[in-house]
């Protein structure tokens, strides 16, 4: 795993981000350990990010970090997922929690089903967001096969197919240290910080390269234009260029 430490002498805040190269476009791949070819529903990377905070004892790691006075968050993009926090105090307590929850996923039939309702509501909110709809429709006009045209959160239909087994399969494939990067910035002694990070990491075998499979995309656009009616005070438009 790549660990990048950026010392900032006398900096008040400390910042850490831990990311994995697993995003919404990674929906077809070959597992490196088994050679199994896997297709997953749209929205799994985002769904997995949401579920990482829940603990077996019923607590939530975001709440735990907030109780320490730490500003924590996570996000998913087309090509990666990241977990992060910033703080002025309690950095090492926050580091304990971050490394613990990212290394110990907890997925059950019950908590996965519950999350489907929560993410379904989130998808509905984005369906009503003019700016997001503008962007997604532009992607749909430009691309025919590339999964970048699909919403990062997936659809209500696609997330209904997500199971604990799917989540664990993706976690075990993409959350391997060989596929992850950590960046830390603040007033640290790099050698000491690196030692503290390594003490907390679970040693895993390097599983080898993950073979991602992407559909062949033609140079031609999918459609020239698309118009959608929504309640707005001013019209919105977006011009896309397919490279």
PLM feature segments, named:
Residues 1-60, 168-243:
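His/Glu-rich zincin catalytic helix
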Residues 5-7, 55, 61-210, 243:
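Charge-rich, well-structured scaffold segments of protease-associated domains
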């Amino acid at each position: 795993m790549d660990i990048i430490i950026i010392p900032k002498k006398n900096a008040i805040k400390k910042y850490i981000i831990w990311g994995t190269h697993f995003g919404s476009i990674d929906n077809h791949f070959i597992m490196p350990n088994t050679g199994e070819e896997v297709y997953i529903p749209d929205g799994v990377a985002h769904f997995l990010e949401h579920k990482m905070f829940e603990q077996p004892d019923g607590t939530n790691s975001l709440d735990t970090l907030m109780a320490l006075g730490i500003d924590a968050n996570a996000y998913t993009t087309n090509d990666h997922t990241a977990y992060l926090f910033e703080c002025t105090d309690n950095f090492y307590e926050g580091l304990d929690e971050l490394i613990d929850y990212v290394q110990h996923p907890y997925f059950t039939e019950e908590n996965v089903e519950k999350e489907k309702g929560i993410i379904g509501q989130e998808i509905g909110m984005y369906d009503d967001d003019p700016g997001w709809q503008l962007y997604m429709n532009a992607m749909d006009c430009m691309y025919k096969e590339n999964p970048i045209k699909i919403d990062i959160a997936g659809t209500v239909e696609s997330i209904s197919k997500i199971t604990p087994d799917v989540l664990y399969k993706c976690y075990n494939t993409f959350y391997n240290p060989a596929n992850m990067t950590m960046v830390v910035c603040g007033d640290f002694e790099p050698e000491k910080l690196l030692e503290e990070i390594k003490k907390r990491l679970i040693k895993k075998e390097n599983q080898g390269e993950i073979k991602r499979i992407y559909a062949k995309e033609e140079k031609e656009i999918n459609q020239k234009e698309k118009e959608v009616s929504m309640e707005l005070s001013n019209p919105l438009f977006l011009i896309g260029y397919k490279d």
